[in-house]
A protein has these predicted regions:
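Histidine/acidic-residue-rich, glycine-tolerant segments that coordinate divalent metal ions
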Residues: 87-96, 102-160
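Receiver (REC) domain switch-region micro-motif
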Residues: 36, 49, 134
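Divalent metal-coordination and catalytic microenvironments
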Residues: 6, 21, 41, 52, ...
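Short strand->helix junction
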Residues: 9, 55-56, 141
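Histidine-rich, glycine-flanked metal-binding segment
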Residues: 1-46
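Structural signal for conserved beta-strand scaffold positions within catalytic alpha/beta enzyme cores
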Residues: 37-38, 83, 113
Length: 160
């Protein structure tokens, strides 16, 4: 696919060639097989990353699911989200991660899942998963009773 005459974020007007899901080239007078779209100098931006979302599934799908949250993200130009761990159950064990990942299969965008730390977290099983980060470590209470004390915080930092 080729997008001609697109205004980039820095104000330059260029052609953008896309191969599959990746930008292949940015320049002038590019050629490509397949669809050609004239952007007519409209702004063309890459997909955004929202590294801090709170999809409430599992535990509270009446508030938001991976499907509804990711649909909203995609509508706003977000192509990757990272969900925070304070759900019910909190994402503090490998089993809880697996449960959340099953829900995330309904996502319409790429995603990452943050792990969390609680007094009963299981770092061995949690950190064996593709956890994006240990996100939102709470020194006060939050959804999922995720508040921890300073000693556990220090231990979590060393394990991560």
């Amino acid at each position: 696919m080729l997008v001609r005459n697109a205004t980039l974020a820095d104000g330059r007007v260029r052609d953008v060639r896309i191969d599959g899901e990746r930008i292949d080239a940015v320049g002038t007078d590019l050629t490509a097989e397949g669809e050609v779209v004239d952007a007519d100098e409209r702004l063309l931006l890459p997909g955004a990353v929202d590294a801090h979302v709170h999809f409430r599934e599992p535990g509270a799908p009446h508030k938001e699911t991976w499907r509804t949250g990711s649909r909203s993200a995609a509508a706003g130009g977000v192509t990757t989200v990272v969900d925070q761990p304070n759900t019910d159950p909190p994402t503090t064990t490998g089993a809880a991660y697996d449960q959340k990942e099953l829900c995330a299969d309904d996502a319409l965008v790429d995603y990452g899942i943050n792990g969390g730390v609680t007094p009963d977290w299981d770092p061995e099983t949690l950190l064996d998963r593709p956890v994006f980060a240990l996100g939102e470590v709470f020194l006060a209470d939050s959804t999922g009773e995720m508040g921890i004390d300073g000693d556990l915080f220090e231990d979590a930092v060393h394990r991560a």
